[in-house]
Amino acid sequence: MSTKSYRSILPNNVPSTGKVSFARGNPIITVTLGRQDAMLDLSSLRLSGNLDVWSNAAGTEHPQGAGPARAAELQGSHKLGIYSCIDQLVFRHAETKQVIEHIRHYGRFMSSYMPVMAGMQDVAGHLSKSALIMPNYQAYRDNVIRSTRSSVFCVSLPAGLTLGVDKLPLDKVPLEIEIHLAPDSQFFYSSDATTTNISNAFYELSGLELTCEVETGVKSPDKGVLDFNSI
């Protein structure tokens, strides 16, 4: 008899503070789903955590738009939301390190994927909460960039593997997921083409975890291939 359950996995390389950022030397997040007698539902993979935006190098001030120190011109992509943080996405065998799929320029892919898969109703509704994708730049600036509280997110990881393969036998293919963070200069832009007040701005992620659904008690195939369209 098969049983479905949910797993929550913490990244392997998060420092003791629980916070990661490109600016502070943590450009790569690695999560490992080790070898186990279970079938992984790839469509259920979700990355969740908190996003903070800081206007100074010390990470103590939010860009609230009140004076030079507040970086009033600081902006980000309202069309990508939290996906702006991801520069590359890699899936590989956790033991042999054989690469299954490697997507470079992930933000460019998502900028083409999201308009096709989501409408304005989605953006104004659940995507504004789950992926921090907003209807316009002002909503993103006011609710994410200038927010004095952490912005919570929980997103899927669209890729050829997650969209094209239903179940993955973890007893034969333990999975390692590697997320390369985007540089701050790629995540932010200036609304008036001047960068004097935003040169020290950076984004920071915390409380990161990967959740997924696995099914146990199911016989995994003795042979076969992973058939999917790589992106």
Residue ranges, per PLM feature:
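Short, low-complexity Pro/Thr/Gly
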Residues: M1-I231
